Amino acid sequence: MDSNNTEFKDNYQHIPDDIPLTNIKLPNEWVLYLYDKQLFKKMANRPNFQAKPHKALCTISTVNDLLYIMELMKVNNDPKIKSVETDGKINLDANDYIIMRKGIEPIWEDPRNSNGGTFTVKMDHSKGYDVWKIFIQYILGETLTSEISDMKSINGITVSYISDSYNFQNPASKNTLGNTLGNSLGNSLGNGLGNSFTYIKIWDGKPDRTRDQFVSMLPATIIDKIKSDSLMYSQNSKKKHFNEKNIIGKLNSGRKPSNTRGGFSSFGNKRY
């Protein structure tokens, strides 16, 4: 059993060692999407431009599926080595990805997303994969929070790699958790691999949640990982381009993107 399998089983002690991971169903099914945010911006800004910026790649329904995706997403954290060749992988250096509950469209306007918001963590890219991996284990295992009603409103997770410096537009919302708790941990932005960052966004369907309310329900393991990073919570209904006229029609037009970021053109046809 590899380290990923061991780590996962450590978090789920009730899984007998003699049961193959391929036979263990996740509590619910999820869909992995390749996301092209530049295409979305074009669609939002051009009245007659129709496209679908998110492309469904596969369904994640078993523990084995989850472990396989985590393995494919691995990145090289050595600051002297930049991963540019993906070898068919879907690692976090190459593209932006969304994992969403099956049956929910990965857009703000979906009825199960529209009244909620997104909790965003901005961190140095060198630790982005590790934090993302922990988040998806909790989310897809339905254990991010002990409250069932809160867990049911966690609809998905987006991960993005940003290679240039970018700051949240709401300074009051980007304080680190360490500062919020009165610690002297400071803000870690800019202290890592150049200006390379990982953004992780959690899709939350619950209305009127605040950043601190969301943080308070997270496991201690995650809080410890992100307490010195930049955190923000934003309501979907207040975002630019929310409920743009004909946005649903544009998304459902069936028009394919003209190009794909990264070296990931054939994975969409792969089954497992």
Swiss-Prot record:
Residues 249-272 are annotated as: Disordered. Residues 255-272 have a biased composition (Polar residues). The keyword Chloroplast does not apply. This is Eukaryotic translation initiation factor 4E homolog. Belongs to the eukaryotic initiation factor 4E family. It comes from Acanthamoeba polyphaga mimivirus. One of its GO terms (biological process) is regulation of translation. The keyword Protease does not apply. Keywords: Initiation factor, Protein biosynthesis, RNA-binding, Translation regulation. Recognizes and binds the 7-methylguanosine-containing mRNA cap during an early step in the initiation of protein synthesis and facilitates ribosome binding by inducing the unwinding of the mRNAs secondary structures. InterPro entries: TIF_eIF4e-like (IPR023398), TIF_eIF_4E (IPR001040). One of its GO terms (molecular function) is RNA 7-methylguanosine cap binding. Transmembrane segments: none annotated. Pfam families: IF4E.
